[in-house]
Curated annotation (Swiss-Prot):
N-[(5S)-5-amino-5-carboxypentanoyl]-L-cysteinyl-D-valine binds at residues 84, 88, 186, 209, 211, 276. It comes from the Bacteria. This is Isopenicillin N synthase. Its EC number is 1.21.3.1.
């Protein structure tokens, strides 16, 4: 029988209220979770996840091979100039999962960062509206909703780190966030591509990695698949399709000098139709938070200050080099 990691369910609704004692209690629970397994579930978030699952399932099933190719990012379709926004193809005999990634809806042709040609900034392309009515509207609204959830959770992190609850707000804005949503589909296949094995012999759909983000806010189908590395080895992460699964990314680890590490995790092989929809909460290109450690935690030395744009660009490239194109 597989062992489960300790992944608490935390009611985050109090972080939107005015009772500081309640906020401090929630922050303390976030602190324990992130210093423990590295994961927690955010409950009472106010997002209709059942609607998200149905809309995304229906959309994936309606996409044609031709549409996927037309939207495929440059790694798959050299004619497409986009590196982040677009379709990430399944590759027969090599890779089963497929996904569509979209970025900040605020990025349009007149946005200052788009005009400047900054890396990691792209104007979203979408499937044809006539074939997929309401898709763009639905997912732009979801981006706003899950951004707000992440902003609330970051209040808890700020309090847990001994800062004002608004600490992250000036760096995390809908106007210029580099955040992204990925609509990942893992299909059921009669002939699944060859699998990679973990060092413990576990069959894997995606190898061990850390998230390139400040934090990650994930919705997933209630089918067990994720494992987190602990001192006891890899442990299963309990599943829920009612709550968001939250973990720190490597930028949070960097700015806290390792106080909140980015948990190493992996995806087990499960041959079942399911969804994984991460929101990678990213700051703006120019944001740069000076690393610090909450008292009394004070490791020797300290990390250098790194702008978020540089961090994200290099972090994503390193992830692709280590694990291959997603």
């Amino acid at each position: 029988m597989n062992r489960h990691a300790d992944v608490p369910v935390i009611d985050i609704s109090g972080l939107s209220g005015n009772d500081m004692d309640v906020k401090k209690d929630i922050a303390a629970r976030i602190d324990r979770a992130c210093r423990g397994s590295g994961f927690f579930y955010a409950a009472n978030h106010g997002v209709d996840l059942a609607a998200l699952q149905k809309f995304t399932t229906d959309w994936h099933m309606a996409m044609s091979a031709e549409e996927k190719w037309e939207l495929a990012i440059r790694a798959y379709n050299p004619a497409n100039p986009r590196n982040r926004n677009g379709y990430y193809m399944a590759v027969e005999g090599k890779k089963a999962n497929e996904s569509f990634c979209y970025l900040n809806p605020s990025f349009d042709a007149d946005h200052a960062t788009i005009k400047a040609g900054l890396p990691s900034h792209e104007v979203n392309i979408w499937p044809d509206e006539a074939r997929h009515p309401g898709m763009r509207r639905f997912y732009e609204a979801y981006f706003s909703d899950v951004f707000d959830v992440a902003a609330v959770i970051l209040r808890g992190f700020a309090i847990a780190l001994g800062r004002e609850e608004s600490f992250f707000e000036r760096h995390f804005s809908m106007d210029d966030t580099l955040s992204a949503v990925s609509l990942i589909r893992y299909p059921f296949l009669e002939n699944y591509p060859p699998l990679k094995l973990g060092p413990d012999g576990e069959k894997l759909s995606f190898e061990h990695h850390q998230d390139v983000s400040l934090i990650t806010v994930l919705y997933q189908t209630a089918i067990p698949n994720l494992q987190v590395e602990t001192a006891e080895g890899y442990l299963d992460i309990p599943v829920s399709d009612e709550h968001f699964l939250v973990n720190c990314g490597t930028y949070m680890a960097h700015i806290t000098n390792g106080y909140y590490p980015a948990p190493v995790h992996r995806v087990k092989y499960i041959n079942a139709e399911r969804l994984s929809i991460p929101f990678f909460a990213n700051l703006s290109h120019a944001s740069a938070i000076d690393p610090f450690a909450p008292p009394p935690y004070a490791p020797p030395g300290g990390n250098p200050t790194v702008s978020y744009g540089d961090y994200l660009q290099h972090g994503l490239l390193d992830l692709i080099r280590a694990n291959g194109q997603t």
